[in-house]
């Protein structure tokens, strides 16, 4: 009967019925769908519609449906205004009465002016929990975790976005990401509509955790463009704290180990299960999750109410078997891969560009004098700038600079002005930490030397090293009270800021600690291996097992990951470790090379017996030499284009970094001899500008001419500057997709015009403007052997285009010019047309996607009548029409050397196509005219089926 009444009301204007009658007719519908009675009672009390006695009567009802019926009885008995207010509460508190949204929409309820003035209090558990989460995340993300615990930096004042790049499944560049909001939107960079995980990856220290902290801060303050009502943040390394016997329900994981609802947790969890799309999860550092727990022994799916091991819950959350539809943002270091079916987007963090670095310097040093002093020192040392491209290292260097300013107030604080290694940076920050408790006023200035500082802090450093080594050995990054006590760390040591305390996360109570960054743990691990006299040479070198030869199985890794492909949607646990990233081992090796370098011996002799130091140094060098020979010999080689090409892998970059840390010319010469090729391919290795310092250190000893391919990396202008020692021997220089600006091109111009040996210059997809185009033109003018020039997808307009075209016209060696994806327009096209006339060498020209109209097309067609060298011209994605087609048809009746004419995605119709087809009757040289994507209908294209050289579809 009541159900019939409900349907009877559908589509009937509310004004025709009283509010009391509406509640009567829909009584059972309301009884069924109202879950939260307390919120109704609270609002009726707040506005004086219910007395305390009314509230007690409702509370005395034994079941929720009985409570709803009693509220309805009381509301209806109090008249129209109270009934209308009752409906107003249902309308305003959408989360509390989500099941009534459709019904409220159907009845077209609109409150009167009187009712709109009434106060609505939201005591709904779901809404309260959202506010609780916002408060907690806002508090947790307010301060940037600083390397000295006594200092807190406001995140709002120190955070800066880094270069964020959308990439495809195979890490191909899809363009830059506009900002953090774009991470979660549904229109930018989506690879898989069914995927739920946004995967953010990048090298250690590039800012992944800071990005998540900023995301939390924005969500907590309501500034994030997201509909998420719940935000759960987990650090993957914390899951390593759980024992194999630990069992948790999903509700316990979310509430007891993150944030427990202040009221009605069952109601909150029920809402989350019903509407998982209202939740956003962030999982930080998947590569830092290591456990012996075997997920292959447990079912693929699990029930949200049944207890399971926390790693099972994590795996099923990531795979979507739990809370399917919830948004997930996952971070990991470069090298970790996630199954495609889970991915929604992939975002690569690139670190600071030169402009980011200068902006960050201004933010960290608002005082003008200090700011200018710092920037002058950075400009004088590209090597230091390259290190600062990694936000973590930049922050450490800047904080050390600030410390020197404070300690030596009134004097000029100075950053190193020579080659700086990562070991130098971490020794510096160690010295700063240890000197924090020392007097720093002008009256009591601390004058201890670095050696004295380290000697005074020997006990602390050794204890920290013991903690770090124990964790690194097991790939663990969180330490309990027992590990800290076993190393004899004292309370004062913990206050120095190397270790920071964490909130309780495991099932057992007790304080946990972590180093402020993985790289610091690696540094102290290396320090322990060098300084502890009980460490054997075998143990000293054990992390070098990560230096596997290309093609070797990864089973020799120091520690295998707990994760299997099965848990994330793959088929088998067997085979290579899907999470091969072992940067903590690689950084340990790097710091070992740095600490045992000749330059550090005087410092370390204060701490380590001379004989032990000599023995360890000898063992490291012997192993380093043997590893280098073996690895370089095993690199894949191929004969291509007249070159003996060697394709280096990312491990080769780690070797270069270790060699650079030694600052040993002997090791550099050995590595250079081992290359044994004249073409070194380092494309897609995620090399950064600092790696160019290491590469130059080795190639400086390579005395033959060399082709160098560094396409698709992250070098920027600082990287180009660091390559300066190499340019005297580089004949092929491929620097495409590297964030290079006009500043970097200027360096190239200055260097390449000195030696004039370059034959190939690749600068595709950078940030070069007309200014840089002029430098490129100068290179082409002065380097008479330059044959291949790739300048596509930059920011070059007609002015820059004319400069390049003039240089092409004057060149007798150039054979291939790529200008795709610029904006040279008709003026630029006319300049290239002039260059084409009677050109002696040019065979391939791409002017695709350049805004060229029929006017520019006509000039090019006319010029080709006077050209006998060009065989390929690409004019794809311009604005050419039938008039242009007619001009090219006339050209084809004269030109008998052109082989490929690409006019794809222009505005040519069947009429223009017919003219081109007729011209082919008098041209036997051309092999194809590509017209795909023009204004030609399929039925019109059939006319040209017999002419195989016309390609319409």
Curated annotation (Swiss-Prot):
One of its GO terms (molecular function) is ATP binding. The gene is Nod1. It is found in: Cell membrane; Apical cell membrane; Basolateral cell membrane; Cytoplasm. Although ubiquitously expressed, NOD1 levels are more abundant in immune cells, the gastrointestinal tract, and adipose tissue. The keyword ATP-binding applies. One of its GO terms (biological process) is innate immune response. Disruption phenotype: No visible phenotype in absence of infection. Mice however show impaired cytokine secretion in response to bacterial infection: macrophages do not secrete cytokines in response to synthetic gamma-D-glutamyl-meso-diaminopimelic acid (iE-DAP) and do not prime the lipopolysaccharide response. Deletion mutant mice show a normal glucose tolerance but the level of circulating insulin after glucose infusion was significantly lower than in wild-type mice. Mice lacking Nod1 and Nod2 are protected from high-fat diet-induced inflammation, lipid accumulation, and peripheral insulin intolerance. It is a lipid-anchor. Belongs to the NOD1-NOD2 family. The keyword Metal-binding does not apply. Its main location: membrane. This is Nucleotide-binding oligomerization domain-containing protein 1. It comes from Mus musculus.
